[in-house]
Amino acid sequence: WTGTWFADIAGKTDRSVTLASGMKYLDTYLYPQESIRTPSICLLFWKGDDRMVGHNRFRRFVMAHHTPKVDGKPAHFPESSSFNYGDPSPCNEYTCLTADYAIALIRRYKQFDIVPEVFWLDAGWYSQAADYKNHKNWANTVGNWTVDREKFPDGLKPVSDEAHKVGAKFMVWFEPERVIKGSQWAEEHPEWMLDAGTDAYLFDLGNPKALEWFCDQIGELIDQNGIDYYRQDFN
């Protein structure tokens, strides 16, 4: 389920368990003939001496009936690798990764002949996300969808070009539907912001004009930076 959901599970006694699950914060209504799909749920009840037998039967059930298949066989998904950047703190991929480091890492993969199918650039590539001294981070700067030119002076295209040079694709993380208050998008188009009661707005994707602008902005970023895969997140 791609939206926010919840599952509250509690053991009341040695012989009973309670479960409440669904879409978190759902407060809506439907017009006649309208319908929506709620999150699906699957419960497995097991009784036996070895709970691992139950675990394994559940896994087999998921593999057999709920795993994407191509020609009757489990689908092969692209092998990917992110641009991991370790300590010392506060350095990590979100704060200290630069174009030079990313390109060097791609070449290192090539040197040892372990190039993945996809190189994945995770969150933090946009403006202000690395400003940890002012308590900024990847999560509280979404809505500033311009490439951080201090870390990537020529945009993301040089990283993409290097990935393509070694035979890989380039994937980039996005979360454009969540817009932090005070961010670039929030300031430019307050009329398209829906207040979610948090530090972030939700972009009004139900507004046709807003949706068109939204797609143009993200599409331009993808085209200009040589992005092959769009990675959608929603926090």
Predicted features along the sequence, with ranges:
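Sequence-level motif detector for i,i+2 pairs with an aromatic at +2
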Residues: 14, 74-77
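Long, charged amphipathic helices and adjacent flexible linkers at domain junctions
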Residues: 62-73
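N-terminal accessory beta-strand-rich subdomains and adjacent acidic, glycine-rich linkers
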Residues: 1-64
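Short, solvent-exposed coil/turn segments
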Residues: 23, 73-74
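Aromatic-lined carbohydrate-binding/catalytic grooves of carbohydrate-active enzymes
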Residues: 76-229, 235
